[in-house]
């Protein structure tokens, strides 16, 4: 529950403050597959005054060595799994490694607002597809610029649900998070879904996609092209039951075929697309137009719309 979540976040605040001297602005790396503790440590580090560094644990050691060398983490909370270079990480940062649940025995802290609107809050590395990976600096101000849009979009989701699924009276929606939490599209869900008090269903491995989806009913899902195509095939082939109620796939339409999106919309899926770079939290513009003519439209000012 959110009550338990907040208590654990308070414990994490205590843990980080007790284990990182002069913590303000110090870096806390998070290197783990998706799990509950990822959210706890993210909020805990930020509320303690530290800077969260999300780490793609599946990068090569030279890539990780470069990135960690740039940020100089004071601690790295991690899941202990060897993704291919565990011995290198232990040799270089063994004294800074902590388990993801290191906070569990700490006393809950009183929360104090110590984060300035323009203070560095998160460092998120790019994929490195255009050269060496770069750390994008996110503050509270630019990180939460899109939250109002996200909350309004939540209202649009409810409007759609009430119109198309009036028999379902549960307005506590849930989001299936299968994309990794080091990716902005999933990381931001830790924050924006909490604004509504809605649920985030975390899945750690794409190989368990259908199993986890079957265990956790979800309304929305952030998708990469492979997942959107899988959803499309399930709908087309009469296997929609496998999706356990998913009705709002969200992606970036630049990646998807417009005809496929339109057909999914005709089959009762609410298609959402977001546009933007990491600096705008991936949601500089949100398009939830379901009309075939505009479902794949890249966002433009209102006076450009037909």
Task: Cite the ranges covered by each PLM segment.
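ATP-dependent adenylate-forming carboxylate-activation enzymes
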Residues: 11, 32-33, 50-68, 80-83, ...
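Conserved AMP-binding/adenylate-forming
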Residues: 13-59, 177-178
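Conserved AMP-binding A3 loop
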Residues: 1-3, 121-149
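Conserved AMP-binding/adenylation subdomain of ANL enzymes
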Residues: 144-174, 181-245
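Gly/Ser/Thr-rich phosphate-binding loop
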Residues: 219-223, 232-294
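Structural core segment of the AMP-binding/adenylate-forming
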Residues: 43, 47-106, 110-114
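Conserved pre-ATP/AMP-binding loop-to-beta segment of ANL
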Residues: 107-125, 131-132, 158-174
């Amino acid at each position: 529950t959110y009550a338990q979540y907040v208590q654990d976040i308070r414990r994490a605040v205590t843990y980080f403050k007790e284990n990182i001297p002069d913590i303000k602005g110090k870096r806390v790396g998070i290197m783990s597959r998706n799990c509950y503790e990822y959210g706890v440590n993210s909020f805990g580090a930020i509320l303690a005054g530290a800077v969260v560094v999300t780490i793609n644990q599946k990068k090569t050691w030279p890539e990780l060595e470069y990135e960690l060398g740039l940020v100089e983490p004071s601690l790295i909370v991690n899941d202990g799994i060897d993704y291919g270079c565990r011995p290198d990480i232990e040799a270089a940062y063994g004294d800074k490694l902590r388990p993801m649940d290191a906070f569990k025995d700490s006393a809950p802290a009183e929360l104090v607002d110590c984060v300035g609107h323009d203070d560095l809050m998160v460092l998120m590395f790019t994929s490195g597809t255009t050269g060496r990976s770069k750390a994008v600096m996110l503050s509270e101000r630019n990180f939460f610029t899109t939250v109002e849009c996200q909350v309004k979009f939540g209202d649009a989701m409810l409007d759609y649900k009430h119109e198309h699924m009036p028999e379902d009276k549960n307005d506590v929606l849930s989001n299936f998070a299968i994309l990794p939490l080091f990716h902005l599209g999933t990381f931001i869900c830790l924050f924006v879904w909490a604004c509504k008090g809605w649920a985030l269903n975390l899945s750690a491995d794409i190989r368990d996609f259908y199993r986890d989806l079957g265990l956790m009913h979800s309304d929305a899902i952030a998708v990469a092209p492979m997942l959107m195509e899988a959803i499309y095939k399930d709908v087309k082939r009469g296997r929609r039951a496998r999706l356990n109620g998913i009705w709002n796939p969200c992606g970036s339409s630049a990646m998807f075929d417009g005809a496929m999106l339109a057909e999914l919309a005709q089959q009762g899926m609410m298609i959402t697309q977001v546009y933007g770079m990491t600096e705008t939290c991936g949601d500089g513009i949100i398009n939830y137009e379901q009309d075939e003519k505009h479902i794949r439209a890249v966002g433009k000012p209102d006076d450009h719309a037909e």
